[in-house]
């Protein structure tokens, strides 16, 4: 019996989907249930293991689609510079290191060749990627973990060089299979099989897993692969995990519903799904009502929170007065800019206010510029990516401007540290973790997302909280809500669900 969890990618700034999987991995470990987490994306800029280990997965829990067909194990990068240099057919005549020591360039007597090695590790002692450049043109890249994992080969193209081939290796250096790329299409060539495209490669892997009725597939992301998974699960049971708002409210009326395109295939083929999993009871009830109203299908839907709390966290010393925080990817849909402007406005009435923003992402530069523009750098700070477990409880208030959260892991963690919350009155996370007037405030989202009204509403709510709320009562209310999300309760819910699925 194995529980296979299927996803696409993962990165340093992981989304709630990956964090939900990491929480699930902890629970399945505690239940002693074998689990594998499958990632189907290609990883070039970073070793997949560094991403998965960073978020809490164990190496033996990970399956990488491209690595599945080799005997190279999921592992951190430990291939040494000395090992690389031992493969050179001639000694370098010169070495140059970049200022940050993350790149070393080797020059040889043959002036037409140089080699770039991207380094990894605290002392940059390991090699992660190597580029071979001849006559100023890239011809090959090699990627390493504890051994060479795969190589990419390049040929001249209209706009410089273009990737034309990949070779994936076994531990002994032999080629396990090759990927031929042409016109952005891939053909995977094995000794006994050819797969035309990524979908056929995934199909090949699913067939090789020899899934039985004792196996369970949990489909977390399905973009581009949903149909392949549905058609190749064999006798295994299939559950689809809903991580976000599942429909478009603006384009839904009493006769027609517009499903979220990420879930449309799954919902259209709900008769082939053993269960759908939402993270909140509110979303479960709504989805049940919508299936009844808009379709003839009545699938099984269960609500299981995507995260849990090992324990409630209490401050070792007094929380910093007038302190606020948020934690999320610095992505446009998180609307951190609204929070910054709202805090800057509120600070004019409450000069003691401070606001710390945890997370990384593509919006960092814009947010930095906004802080400069508002002259807010002294009381609002971008703190970068941090493990927040022991950080929440040092603050007095949590802010969120997300307009949709399927669950909101940081919201759960915030109430688990006694933090009241201010955010929009929107499904599903905010409405699950905040009782407006008790442990924070829910703000009505204005039509058209009127920026000035939103900023003013956040400023007014922050002022109201710090001047009118009894903080001790609000904090206790958050702790009371968090009790329902303690680890042992979630373990039982997963245990019951899995047993029901496999025994059905």
Swiss-Prot record:
Record keywords: Cell membrane, Cytoplasm, Glycosyltransferase, Membrane, Nucleotide-binding, Transferase
Pfam family, one: GtfA_EBD
Main location: cytoplasm
Traits of the deletion mutant: No glycosylation of serine-rich fimbrial adhesin Fap1, an unglycosylated version of Fap1 accumulates that is larger than the wild-type protein. No further defect in a double gtfA/gtfB disruption mutant, but biofilm formation is further decreased than in a gtfB deletion.
Function summary: Required for polymorphic O-glycosylation of serine-rich repeat protein Fap1. Catalyzes the first step in glycosylation by transferring N-acetylglucosamine from UDP-GlcNAc to serine residues in Fap1. Part of the accessory SecA2/SecY2 system specifically required to export Fap1, a serine-rich fimbrial adhesin encoded upstream in the same operon. The GtfA-GtfB (Gtf1-Gtf2 in this bacteria) complex adds GlcNAc from UDP-GlcNAc to Fap1, attaching the first sugar residue. Cannot use not UDP-Glc as substrate.
Catalytic activity reported: L-seryl-[protein] + UDP-N-acetyl-alpha-D-glucosamine = 3-O-[N-acetyl-alpha-D-glucosaminyl]-L-seryl-[protein] + UDP + H(+)
Protein source organism: Streptococcus parasanguinis
Record-linked SUPFAM superfamilies: UDP-Glycosyltransferase/glycogen phosphorylase
PANTHER family named among the record's database cross-references: GLYCOSYLTRANSFERASE, TEICHURONIC ACID BIOSYNTHESIS GLYCOSYLTRANSFERASE TUAH-RELATED
CDD domains in UniProt: GT4_GtfA-like
The EC number(s) this enzyme carries: 2.4.1.-
Pathway involvement of the protein, from the record: Protein modification; protein glycosylation
Protein name (Swiss-Prot/TrEMBL): UDP-N-acetylglucosamine--peptide N-acetylglucosaminyltransferase GtfA subunit
One Gene Ontology cellular component annotation held by this UniProt entry: cytoplasm
Subcellular location per the Swiss-Prot or TrEMBL entry: Cytoplasm; Cell membrane
Listed NCBIfam families: accessory Sec system glycosyltransferase GtfA (TIGR02918)
């Amino acid at each position: 019996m194995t529980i296979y969890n299927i996803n696409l990618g993962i990165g340093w700034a992981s989304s709630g989907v990956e964090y939900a999987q990491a929480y699930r991995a902890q629970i399945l470990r505690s239940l002693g249930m074998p689990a594998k987490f499958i990632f189907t994306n290609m990883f070039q800029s970073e070793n997949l293991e560094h991403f998965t280990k960073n978020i809490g997965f164990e190496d033996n829990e990970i399956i990488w689609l491209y690595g599945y067909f080799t005997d190279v194990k999921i592992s951190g990068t430990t291939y040494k510079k000395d090992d690389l240099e031992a493969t050179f057919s001639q000694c370098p005549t010169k070495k140059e290191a970049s200022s940050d020591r993350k790149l070393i360039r080797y020059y040889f007597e043959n002036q037409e060749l140089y080699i770039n090695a991207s380094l990894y590790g605290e002392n940059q002692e390991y090699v992660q990627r190597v580029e071979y450049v001849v006559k100023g043109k890239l011809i090959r890249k090699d990627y390493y973990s504890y051994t060479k994992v795969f190589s990419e080969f390049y040929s001249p193209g209209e706009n410089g060089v273009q990737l034309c081939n990949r070779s994936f290796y076994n531990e002994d250096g032999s080629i396990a299979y090759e990927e031929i790329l042409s016109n952005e299409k891939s053909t995977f060539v094995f000794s006994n099989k050819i797969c035309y495209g990524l979908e056929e490669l995934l199909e090949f892997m699913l067939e090789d897993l020899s899934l039985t009725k004792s196996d369970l597939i949990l489909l977390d992301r399905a973009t581009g692969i949903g149909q392949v998974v549905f058609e190749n699960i064999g006798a295994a049971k299939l559950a689809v995990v809903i991580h976000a708002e599942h429909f478009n409210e603006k384009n839904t009326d009493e006769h027609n519903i517009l499903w979220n395109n990420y879930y449309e295939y799954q919902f259209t083929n709900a008769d082939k799904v053993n269960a759908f999993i939402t993270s909140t009871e509110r979303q479960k009830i709504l989805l049940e009502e919508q299936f009844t109203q808009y379709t003839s299908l009545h699938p099984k839907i269960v609500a299981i929170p995507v995260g849990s709390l090992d324990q409630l966290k209490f401050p070792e010393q007094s929380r910093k007065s007038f302190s606020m925080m948020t934690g999320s990817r610095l992505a446009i849909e998180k609307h951190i800019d609204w929070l910054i402007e709202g805090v800057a406005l509120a600070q004019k009435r409450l000069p003691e206010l401070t606001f710390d923003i945890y997370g990384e992402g593509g919006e960092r530069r814009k947010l930095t510029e906004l802080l400069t523009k508002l002259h807010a750098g002294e009381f609002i700070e971008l703190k970068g990516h941090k493990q927040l477990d022991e950080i929440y409880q040092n603050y007095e208030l949590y802010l969120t401007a997300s307009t949709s959260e399927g669950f909101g892991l940081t919201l759960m963690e915030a109430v688990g540290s006694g933090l009241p919350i201010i955010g929009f009155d929107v499904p599903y996370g905010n409405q699950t973790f905040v009782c407006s007037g008790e442990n924070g405030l829910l703000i009505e989202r204005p039509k058209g997302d009127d920026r000035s009204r939103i900023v003013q509403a956040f400023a007014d709510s922050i002022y109201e909280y710090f001047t009118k709320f009894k903080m001790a009562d609000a904090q206790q209310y958050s702790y009371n809500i968090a009790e329902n999300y303690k680890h042992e309760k979630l373990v039982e819910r997963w245990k019951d669900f899995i047993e029901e699925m496999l025994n059905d």
